[in-house]
């Protein structure tokens, strides 16, 4: 009974961990999609510069192939573990354990790689000034994607221009910066701020923000946190799976207490029936002798009369 209760407890815990795998996988997919859109805008602004190379080397090998592959595999593996737990199938549980171990090793290698990449970003502050060349095509019908990227980046990082908001006046034919440079954005806000109060515009340039973005570790820390969370959950799942495999394996080799009791009762009943069968001839002989004695006594009494 104690082993059966332990198996039930292990199965419930594995159900919960598989549900957690599905939720975390969906979260990783959402974060990867957000990071992809975010980085695509950065790549649009940094095309044909050394900054583009830095972005690709730092983030894309992790975000696209590894994170997406891990979350897709975890969804499938979670289903495999759920089926194995429900059916108590040793083969499915063994596959579940082996797949989790392989994914964990991949995540561990990915984490080590991101720590090494932190000091390998090939970008300097002087490279950020080259982004000014990407400002000349802002607002042109042929470069709507570039216009969208600049607006997205300035809103997201709360910056304006590359070094200062006056970069827009120097590099383009615009009389004032885009409206995305406004602290409180609305149509025509940049023109109003340029004519009345410049403090309504973001004063810091986007070059410094992007440099901090590339040299910093905020985004990599998010990826590491997700990787560590999934890794810890995988370790717990592997421990529970091994324990459940051990319990199910020995439960099949050794009969349970109820089976032993039923076997003992069946053996006792069989022995009782066998004993009765053995005693039947003796009882029949005793009955015959008793009948003969009674008939002899009756005959003797009749002769005396």
Swiss-Prot record:
Covalently lipidated residues, kind S-palmitoyl cysteine: 9, 12, 83
Membrane topology: Multi-pass membrane protein
Tissues with expression: Expressed in the neonatal retinal vasculature but not other retinal tissues. Also detected in the neonatal meningeal vasculature and in nonvascular cell types, such as the smooth muscle cells in the neonatal intestine.
GO cellular component, one term: plasma membrane
TM helices/strands, residue ranges: 13-33, 60-80, 90-110, 225-245
InterPro entries according to UniProt: Tetraspanin/Peripherin, Tetraspanin_animals, Tetraspanin_CS, Tetraspanin_EC2_sf
Biological process according to GO: angiogenesis; cell surface receptor signaling pathway; maintenance of blood-brain barrier; Norrin signaling pathway; regulation of angiogenesis; retina layer formation
Extracellular face residues: 34-59, 111-224
Keyword Secreted assigned: no
Main location: membrane
One Pfam family here: Tetraspanin
Top-level taxon of the source organism: Eukaryota
Compartment(s) of residence: Cell membrane
Subunit structure as annotated in this protein's UniProt entry: Interacts (when palmitoylated) with ADAM10. Interacts with MMP14/MT1-MMP. Component of a complex, at least composed of TSPAN12, FZD4 and norrin (NDP).
Job of this protein: Regulator of cell surface receptor signal transduction. Acts as a regulator of membrane proteinases such as ADAM10 and MMP14/MT1-MMP. Activates ADAM10-dependent cleavage activity of amyloid precursor protein (APP). Activates MMP14/MT1-MMP-dependent cleavage activity. Plays a central role in retinal vascularization by regulating norrin (NDP) signal transduction. Acts in concert with norrin (NDP) to promote FZD4 multimerization and subsequent activation of FZD4, leading to promote accumulation of beta-catenin (CTNNB1) and stimulate LEF/TCF-mediated transcriptional programs.
Stated name of the protein: Tetraspanin-12
Name of the gene: Tspan12
């Amino acid at each position: 009974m104690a082993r059966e209760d332990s198996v039930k407890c292990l199965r419930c815990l594995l159900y919960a961990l598989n549900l957690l795998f599905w939720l975390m996988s969906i979260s990783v997919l959402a974060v990867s999609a957000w990071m992809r859109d975010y980085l695509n805008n950065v790549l649009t602004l940094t095309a044909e510069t050394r900054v583009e190379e830095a972005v690709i080397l730092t983030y894309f090998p992790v975000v696209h192939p590894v994170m997406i592959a891990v979350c897709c595999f975890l969804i499938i593996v979670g289903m495999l573990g759920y089926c194995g737990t429900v059916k108590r199938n040793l083969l499915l549980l063994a596959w579940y354990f082996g797949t989790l171990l392989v994914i964990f090793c991949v995540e561990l290698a990915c984490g080590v790689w991101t720590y090494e990449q932190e000091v390998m970003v090939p970008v300097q502050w002087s490279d950020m000034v080259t982004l000014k060349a990407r400002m000349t095509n802002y607002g042109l019908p042929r470069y709507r994607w570039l216009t969208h990227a600049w607006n997205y980046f300035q809103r997201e990082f709360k910056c304006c221009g590359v070094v200062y908001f006056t970069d827009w006046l120097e590099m383009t034919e615009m009389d004032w910066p885009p409206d995305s440079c406004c602290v409180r954005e609305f149509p025509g806000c940049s023109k109003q701020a340029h004519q009345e109060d410049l403090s309504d515009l973001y004063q810091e340039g986007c070059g410094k923000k992007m440099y901090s973005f590339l040299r910093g570790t905020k985004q990599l820390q998010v990826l590491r946190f997700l990787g560590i969370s999934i890794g810890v959950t995988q370790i717990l799942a592997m421990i529970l799976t091994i324990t459940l495999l051990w319990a199910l394996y020995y439960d099949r080799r050794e009969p349970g207490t109820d089976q032993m009791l039923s076997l003992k009762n069946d053996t006792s009943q069989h022995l009782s029936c066998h004993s009765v069968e053995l005693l039947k001839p003796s009882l029949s002989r005793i009955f015959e002798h008793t009948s003969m004695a009674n008939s002899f006594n009756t005959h003797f009494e009749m002769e005396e009369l």
